[in-house]
Amino acid sequence: MNAVGAHTIRASTVLPARRRDIELHTADGLRLVGELALPLERDPVATLITLHPLPTHGGYMDSHVFRKASYRLPALADIAVLRFNTRGTTSDRGTSEGGYDAARDERFDVAAAIEFAEFAQAPALVNRWLLGWSFGTDLALMYGNDPAVEGAILLSPPLKFSGPEHLQGWAASGRSVVALVPELDDYLRPDEAVKRFSAIPQARVIGVEGAKHLWVGEPYLRRVLDEIVATVRPGFGPLPTTWHGDVASASVIAPAKKTAL
C-alpha cells in the first residue's frame, strides 16, 4: 500500500474497496468462482454484472477492462463490480466447474450471476446492469433480458452468437442497450453496428475513434469507464485521473495474444 497523497491513476493502480470472493451456483448444478468489489464505506449506487470475452481466446474474469473497472469504480463512482469465470474458465481466482459450451449452457451462468446480484444483501446490489465484452455481449443479448436488470452495456459486440430474435426481445422490453464500438474493430465497426442495432429502437451505438477490439491503452480504457459511469449513474463524471489517499499496485496482465472474441 502506497502512502497517502495525490497519485496518478495508472493501469496497475488499485483503489480502496471491499473485495470478497464469491461463488455462483447454476441451475444445472455447477459452481462458478468470482469476486465482488464494493465501495469501501458506502453502499453501491449501481452494480455491474460483467460477462467476459471468449474463454477459448483468452477471455476470463480478469480481462483487463473488467479488472480495472473493479480496481477503480467502487472508489471513484460508488459502483459495485461483480466478476466471475463462466463455466470451465480459469483465472487466479480459480476454475469454474463445467466446460465451455459455445453460448448454449452459458445461459445458466448468466442467470446465476443475475440471481446472485438480485438477492444480495448487506449491501443490496441495486441498479443492476449487465456489462458484456465481445463474447460476453452475445451472452448479455441472448440471456440477460431480465426484469432484474436495467439494461446492457456492450463492449466490442460481434453479434456472432446472438440473432435477430434476441435483438427483437430487447426492443420489446424497452430496456436500455448501449454499445461501445471501436472504430478499428475486427468484427463489427460503428457504421455496420448502427445498422444492426437499429432493430432495437432505444439502443445507442457509440463509436470510439482509434479504438480496437481489445481496448488496449489507458485513453481507451478511461473512455470505456467514463461511458459506463455516464450510463449507470447519469450526471456523474468524468472520472478523475488522480486519487488522494491510499493506493495499492497490482501486476499488469497483458491482453491475450489471441483476439478476445
Residue ranges and their predicted role:
Residues 2-42, 46:
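N-terminal cap/lid segment of alpha/beta-hydrolase-fold proteins
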Residues 99-120:
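Alpha/beta-hydrolase active-site loop
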Residues 131-140:
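Gly/Ala-rich beta-loop-alpha elbow adjacent to hydrolase catalytic centers
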Residues 165-167, 188-198, 220:
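Short alpha-helix in the alpha/beta-hydrolase fold that links the catalytic acid
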Residues 173-174, 178-181, 185:
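Short beta-strand/loop motif that positions the catalytic acidic residue
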